[in-house]
A protein has these predicted regions:
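Cyclic nucleotide-binding regulatory module and flanking cytosolic helices
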Residues: 1-40, 85, 89-92
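Short, small/polar residue-rich loop motifs at catalytic or cofactor-binding pockets
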Residues: 30-31, 49-51
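Cyclic-nucleotide recognition modules
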Residues: 31, 75-133
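Glycine- and acidic-residue-biased ligand/ion/polar-headgroup-sensing regions
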Residues: 41, 52-65, 70, 81-82
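Short phosphate-coordinating micro-motif centered on Lys-Gly-acidic
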Residues: 43-49
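Polybasic "coupling" helices that flank or enter modular domains
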Residues: 104, 126-170
């Protein structure tokens, strides 16, 4: 994929929000990026793998799952093209992938070095704010999910809460 085409695609990604394709192209030139292809149902990462790169789904979709010790699996969430993976875990003390990541369809993921990314966000306030917003939104989503599961014990309570929350949005 050409940098120009990738830059246009990345205008829709939260980390590059508000930047034009030309500015994104200049960023990409500094990032030493790689695009990897994955087949449907391929495991991209396992829970516990070290997270050393910024990762963005640029084509396709994937889901995160956790496996209990007894073998049961829980789907944590689906991610689609344009989403940044595990951004809130990238610079933490324990920067490991929090879930197994499995593709739902043939997919392409963009990888770039987190230290080089850090260099470019130091130089552009908008990029820094975009990253902070990305990890804040992920943290808020996680908090919301924990609260939802904490306050709604039964299936009935969870369904009613979901309906109430989504009814108010329409």
């Amino acid at each position: 994929m050409k940098i120009k085409d990738l830059s246009i695609l990345l205008t829709k990604v939260s980390l590059f929000k508000g930047l034009d394709p030309e500015k994104i192209s200049k960023c990409l030139e500094k990032l030493d990026f790689k695009i990897k292809k994955y087949e449907k149902n391929e495991t991209v990462f396992f829970r516990g793998d070290t997270l050393e790169k910024v990762i963005i789904i640029i084509k396709g979709s994937a889901y995160g799952e956790m496996q209990k010790f007894n073998g049961d699996t829980i789907v944590i969430g689906e991610m689609k093209a344009g989403e940044v993976l595990a951004s809130a875990f990238l610079f933490g003390e324990n920067n490991i992938f929090p879930v197994d990541l499995i593709t739902l369809e043939n997919s392409k993921l963009l990888f770039f070095d987190k230290d080089k990314y850090l260099d470019i966000i130091y130089s552009d306030k908008r990029l820094l704010l975009n990253f902070i917003t990305e990890i804040s939104n992920k943290s808020q989503l996680l908090s919301k999910r924990i609260w939802f599961n904490f306050t709604n014990k039964t299936i009935e309570e969870k369904i009613l809460s979901y309906i109430k929350e989504n009814f108010n949005k329409s």
